[in-house]
Amino acid sequence: MSSDLWHGLRRMRIVISEFISLDGVVQAPGGRDEDRDGGFRHGGWSMRFFDPEVMGAAIDELSRSTDALLFGRRTWQVMAGAWPNRAGDPFADWMNRVQKYVVSDTLSDADATWEPTKIIRGADLAKEVSALRDQPGGYLNIMGSASLVRTLLAADLVDELSLMIEPIVLGGGKRIFPDDDQARAFELTSATTANTGVQVCRYQRAG
């Protein structure tokens, strides 16, 4: 029996979903004011490359296999401020009803108004994610959340990467891969080229 099976059921897998530039930047792909940390001035850089036919289909396919979402605090707050106002759109309705987790030491339960959301404290991150990973289920999907993703990669708690590699170099910004002199091998499982030049790639942890 595969190590990814749990009493005959596939265990939950941790997948990272990112819009990413050629130089590895994931900061603020969706909006001008999404994240200006570090003086970042290219907010919304990914929007002109979005191909609904290819990229939209890939997002829909991944969401169908996703049982829960995990966010860092900043990304969760951006999402919580946007998606509830888009009720009626099928993807927005899915975002609003799916189970969500947010990693934060500052949010209180009263702040978690984008239901259903459960708060995970930073000190409990590895333990909580490992526990979720050991449950039967589909994907635990992490969108954006660069600092959180780096932490999970460094702890070897990532099973798959879903990357939309966009034909642009941004010259600076937040990245997701740890700078820790550790090699981590991934196997390419699928690749599709969008009409806008975006490479839609899926990788799974190798070895």
Report residues per predicted region:
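Portal/gating segments that form or line small-molecule/metal binding sites
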Residues: 6-157, 167-207
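Periplasmic plug
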Residues: 160
